[in-house]
Amino acid sequence: MMFGRFTERAQKVLALAQEEALRLGHNNIGTEHILLGLVREGEGIAAKALQALGLGSEKIQKEVESLIGRGQEMSQTIHYTPRAKKVIELSMDEARKLGHSYVGTEHILLGLIREGEGVAARVLNNLGVSLNKARQQVLQLLGSNETGSSAAGTNSNANTPTLDSLARDLTAIAKEDSLDPVIGRSKEIQRVIEVLSRRTKNNPVLIGEPGVGKTAIAEGLAQQIINNEVPEILRDKRVMTLDMGTVVAGTKYRGEFEDRLKKVMDEIRQAGNIILFIDELHTLIGAGGAEGAIDASNILKPSLARGELQCIGATTLDEYRKYIEKDAALERRFQPIQVDQPSVDESIQILQGLRDRYEAHHRVSITDDAIEAAVKLSDRYISDRFLPDKAIDLIDEAGSKVRLRSFTTPPNLKELEQKLDEVRKEKDAAVQSQEFEKAASLRDTEQRLREQVEDTKKSWKEKQGQENSEVTVDDIAMVVSSWTGVPVSKIAQTETDKLLNMENILHSRVIGQDEAVVAVAKAVRRARAGLKDPKRPIGSFIFLGPTGVGKTELARALAESIFGDEESMIRIDMSEYMEKHSTSRLVGSPPGYVGYDEGGQLTEKVRRKPYSVVLLDEIEKAHPDVFNILLQVLEDGRLTDSKGRTVDFRNTILIMTSNVGASELKRNKYVGFNVQDETQNHKDMKDKVMGELKRAFRPEFINRIDEIIVFHSLEKKHLTEIVSLMSDQLTKRLKEQDLSIELTDAAKAKVAEEGVDLEYGARPLRRAIQKHVEDRLSEELLRGNIHKGQHIVLDVEDGEFVVKTTAKTN
């Protein structure tokens, strides 16, 4: 027998019937055993109907035993009697008549009643229950159950049982006031009503980006139908939202899906008052279409064209283009309605309308300023999502954050609970070691602490009830910061001091470049104070000048001062992009090429860390096409990668370093320490470098840069400071080996003298330290002349470096 359509409870009833037959020692399963199985199952509609008729398990069992008695012999196999088989067939027929796609316990009981001649029917009659009365009881329970379980509470539900089991009735949910209010979408809802009122092809499809409120428009229509704010033609319509996943789920055999969908369509056609809403309309394409079977879209096409089926679809622009537009026959049956992202003002109104729901859920109050901040900050900083969805999510998470914060146990209560646990453990230990006096004393302490805990907890909860937690602008800003990594919360005093002293912080790393340090510090302050142009990067700079004067070092120092770690800087070495074909690696390989799925080396890094210092080192080494890519980054703070995603550069500091003009300077000997007039020297050098820059880069590229900074040549006084910095780095490395080092002024001057080079800036100093300090120390360490815990002094005697060691003083 086929039990595939039987519900779990119905299958349980048949299993219980078999158990009853075995218990009573009968060789066959008859109608009486099925009746016993129905009453023993206890939870289905059939069991409830029998209980309502006053028929309990014991009552029926006694009557069955008195009618047919107990058997003696047990056979190996047990079969259904012809009457029992007929009952199961009739139960399937009853399910079909009621329009149900399943066979439940109620259908089995109706089959028993309809059979009318078996032992079960005699049992019911003997217990004073007429078959007609039993049938009425089942149908009554079945009707109330359908009304309660389906979304709608209207009389038309009986006409659409399959649809009710697969779809949600939005009009019924709207009637219960369970839908969120729909604000500012009257124009789109009006367009939907106009299309629905057409004679044929009355199927609107809502097309828009994810999160702009497409589903909300269908909910808005349901609310208008309930409020009688629609034309006569749409009065008393039911908006049912159908999930294609539910329709496909459980269709194990070929033809089941088509049968289910045809039933839904027949019910809609017969009811005549159903508007079907299919969210994610593109799921129609291919749904249920395996191995030559036709899919859902092809089954629906004829009804959609003739106007027999009113359907509202919703899908994104990308999915519409990818799936619907490819099928011209399906596309012509739908009328597209564009749903645009609401403006900032409209989004604020939407959030104000939703405020009550979120306040009730989180038990907090949300200020007007918080709503405004949620919309404006999400619009500015969360660029890869759409309003109002992203602003609603901000409010939701901020509400959750504030609510959880008020539930945190205060520290004094935690401390008391900890003490109470310790005293309990001590008391138990004292009892076990039979120190009863100590245990009695500890018991008194425990009692006192328990009272303190209860009092503290009570006062905390009372205070909690009186406090009305509030979601403020700061809470919204904190959530934005946690999402994006961009600091938008109110500036703390410690950060204020840091921002005001940024020049000093940078000067401690970069020596002799006042102009560059001041320009960068000003850009950071401008951004953090909220005064920068919101449509452009925080700052874009070109650092020019001879090699070894601190161009890259300043970018590293800036990253460390802002993020606390110079490794958080995004560094792209432009010498890797010298060939024309390599430029595409910045934004990602085009389709069909290796690396398409990996994303761009620049765009992916900025997507992951939108608030960062981006260093494009040695920019003049790159292919000229790279500068064309950078034009829109510099002007609009955005760049589109190979997959069409827009990457936001508005919270980055863009630094490009270049050695343009260095060769010209070398020829003219402008770099050095022998020129008397330093100001004139720098001015001449700047003019030369700017001339070279204009020849190397196109005007539209140079014109978009915020500031072009020409680094000064290093002076002799700077070299000693740089030696001190480099020796500090050596000190850190030696500290790991439990050693400390000190360079005397004479040693520093000697290193500076050895590392002076008129053309190469500070890098020769690094080589001088390697040669005269690090090499000497490594030899002494290997010889065993320097031991752990010693303090090393590097000095100069008779023009030579000498290493002295002493015991380290703490």
From Swiss-Prot:
<dbReference type="Pfam" id="PF00004">
    <property type="entry name" value="AAA"/>
</dbReference>
<comment type="similarity">
    <text>Belongs to the ClpA/ClpB family. ClpC subfamily.</text>
</comment>
<dbReference type="InterPro" id="IPR003959">
    <property type="entry name" value="ATPase_AAA_core"/>
</dbReference>
<dbReference type="InterPro" id="IPR001270">
    <property type="entry name" value="ClpA/B"/>
</dbReference>
<dbReference type="Pfam" id="PF10431">
    <property type="entry name" value="ClpB_D2-small"/>
</dbReference>
<feature type="region of interest" description="Repeat 1">
    <location>
        <begin position="6"/>
        <end position="71"/>
    </location>
</feature>
<dbReference type="InterPro" id="IPR019489">
    <property type="entry name" value="Clp_ATPase_C"/>
</dbReference>
<keyword id="KW-0678">Repressor</keyword>
<dbReference type="GO" id="GO:0005524">
    <property type="term" value="F:ATP binding"/>
</dbReference>
<dbReference type="InterPro" id="IPR036628">
    <property type="entry name" value="Clp_N_dom_sf"/>
</dbReference>
<keyword id="KW-0143">Chaperone</keyword>
<feature type="domain" description="UVR">
    <location>
        <begin position="417"/>
        <end position="452"/>
    </location>
</feature>
<feature type="region of interest" description="Repeat 2">
    <location>
        <begin position="80"/>
        <end position="144"/>
    </location>
</feature>
<comment type="function">
    <text>Competence gene repressor; required for cell growth at high temperature. Negative regulator of comK expression. May interact with MecA to negatively regulate comK.</text>
</comment>
<feature type="binding site">
    <location>
        <begin position="545"/>
        <end position="552"/>
    </location>
    <ligand>
        <name>ATP</name>
    </ligand>
</feature>
<dbReference type="Pfam" id="PF17871">
    <property type="entry name" value="AAA_lid_9"/>
</dbReference>
<dbReference type="InterPro" id="IPR003593">
    <property type="entry name" value="AAA+_ATPase"/>
</dbReference>
<keyword id="KW-0805">Transcription regulation</keyword>
<feature type="region of interest" description="II">
    <location>
        <begin position="471"/>
        <end position="662"/>
    </location>
</feature>
<keyword id="KW-0677">Repeat</keyword>
<keyword id="KW-0178">Competence</keyword>
<keyword id="KW-0804">Transcription</keyword>
<dbReference type="Pfam" id="PF02861">
    <property type="entry name" value="Clp_N"/>
</dbReference>
<feature type="binding site">
    <location>
        <begin position="208"/>
        <end position="215"/>
    </location>
    <ligand>
        <name>ATP</name>
    </ligand>
</feature>
<dbReference type="InterPro" id="IPR018368">
    <property type="entry name" value="ClpA/B_CS1"/>
</dbReference>
<protein>
    <recommendedName>
        <fullName>Negative regulator of genetic competence ClpC/MecB</fullName>
    </recommendedName>
</protein>
<dbReference type="GO" id="GO:0016887">
    <property type="term" value="F:ATP hydrolysis activity"/>
</dbReference>
<feature type="region of interest" description="I">
    <location>
        <begin position="163"/>
        <end position="410"/>
    </location>
</feature>
<dbReference type="GO" id="GO:0030420">
    <property type="term" value="P:establishment of competence for transformation"/>
</dbReference>
<dbReference type="InterPro" id="IPR001943">
    <property type="entry name" value="UVR_dom"/>
</dbReference>
<dbReference type="InterPro" id="IPR028299">
    <property type="entry name" value="ClpA/B_CS2"/>
</dbReference>
<keyword id="KW-0547">Nucleotide-binding</keyword>
<dbReference type="InterPro" id="IPR004176">
    <property type="entry name" value="Clp_R_dom"/>
</dbReference>
<dbReference type="Pfam" id="PF07724">
    <property type="entry name" value="AAA_2"/>
</dbReference>
<keyword id="KW-0067">ATP-binding</keyword>
<dbReference type="InterPro" id="IPR041546">
    <property type="entry name" value="ClpA/ClpB_AAA_lid"/>
</dbReference>
<feature type="domain" description="Clp R">
    <location>
        <begin position="3"/>
        <end position="144"/>
    </location>
</feature>
<dbReference type="InterPro" id="IPR027417">
    <property type="entry name" value="P-loop_NTPase"/>
</dbReference>
<dbReference type="InterPro" id="IPR050130">
    <property type="entry name" value="ClpA_ClpB"/>
</dbReference>
